[in-house]
Curated annotation (Swiss-Prot):
Domain of life: Eukaryota
Pfam families assigned to the protein according to its UniProt record, in alphabetical order: Toxin_8 (PF07365)
Modification type Cysteine amide: residues: 36
Record remark on domains: The cysteine framework is I (CC-C-C). Alpha4/7 pattern.
Entry's Gene Ontology molecular function annotations: acetylcholine receptor inhibitor activity; ion channel regulator activity; toxin activity
S-S bonds: 22-28, 23-36
Region annotation Ser-Xaa-Pro motif, crucial for potent interaction with nAChR: where it falls in the sequence: 24-26
Propeptide: 1-20
GO cellular component, one term: extracellular region
Family to which the UniProt record says this protein belongs: Belongs to the conotoxin A superfamily.
Protein name: Alpha-conotoxin GIC
Subcellular location: Secreted
Length: 40
């Protein structure tokens, strides 16, 4: 099987966690714009 699928799933899981937690904090969101988006 292709390991990239597992990596993608792990990345999605991390990203969703970061979106819920980090992205609600302006300083953290600013450091993770590639995940959180650039809205303020």
């Amino acid at each position: 099987s292709d390991g990239r699928n597992d990596a993608a799933k792990a990345f999605d899981l991390i990203s969703s966690t970061v979106k819920k937690g980090c992205c609600s904090h302006p300083a953290c969101a600013g450091n993770n714009q590639h995940i959180c988006g650039r809205r303020r």
